[in-house]
Amino acid sequence: MPAGGEGPLEGVVQTTSSALREATSSRDYILLTIGFFVCGLQLVFITTHLPTYLVDSGISGDTASWSLALIGLFNIVGAFLCGWLGGIVSKKKTLAIVYLLRGLIIVAFVSLPPSPVIALLFGAAMGLLWLGTIPLTSGLIVTFFGPRHLSMLYGLVFLSHQLGSFVGAWLGGIWYDWYGNYEAMWWLNAGAGLFAFGVNWAIREPEPLAPAPA
């Protein structure tokens, strides 16, 4: 259960409505939900608008496609690695660092001169951080509230992710239509990553229980 929360009494089956009230009154669950909004914002902005950004920067469409492909390829490794790390070190710190690294990689990407090599390196680096947020986020929910209502509680957090996804795709398109570039949107995504780092670092993750003596 979250630090400072009451949690269900041991041996008592918690109702869905009770679990929902507990979660929505939990500071840490709310922070986790806010952070996951940023995840959706970044991921869908990149998948929707990266190809156009690269082509506008003089990079070929083939290279733009390979950059997206590398995101998918390296995501396989990154998601596994983040899930593994979440099992041996602090989940909230690992999650916060994922968001921090995303922000820093975006800063480096838009600060360096565009080139095919930079585009491919960006795809690989972002892929390592792409969906690693999912096992860490769901793991924190289980840590806070147990597994019984995970599908509902994770579903609500994922709704925030999807709202962020909408904002990332829509706002990127609106900005491009108005100004003909993505510069401010990249910096918005970088700043959002730093914001999500702070939000997730502020989560109070319970210490793991020591094993009972034999």
Predicted features along the sequence, with ranges:
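Paired intracellular helix-loop junctions of major facilitator superfamily
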Residues: 141-150, 180
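C-terminal transmembrane helical hairpin of 12-TM major facilitator-type secondary transporters
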Residues: 69-75, 79-81, 88-140
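Loop-to-transmembrane helix entry/capping segments in MFS-fold secondary transporters
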Residues: 61-62, 147-156
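Multi-pass alpha-helical transporter architecture, strongest
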Residues: 190-214
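Juxtamembrane intracellular "pre-TM" segments in multi-pass secondary transporters
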Residues: 2-31
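A membrane-interface helix-boundary motif in multi-pass transporters
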Residues: 174-192
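Extracytoplasmic gate region of multi-pass secondary transporters
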Residues: 21-84, 168
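Interfacial helix-cap and linker-helix signal at transmembrane-aqueous boundaries
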Residues: 54-55, 85-86, 171-180
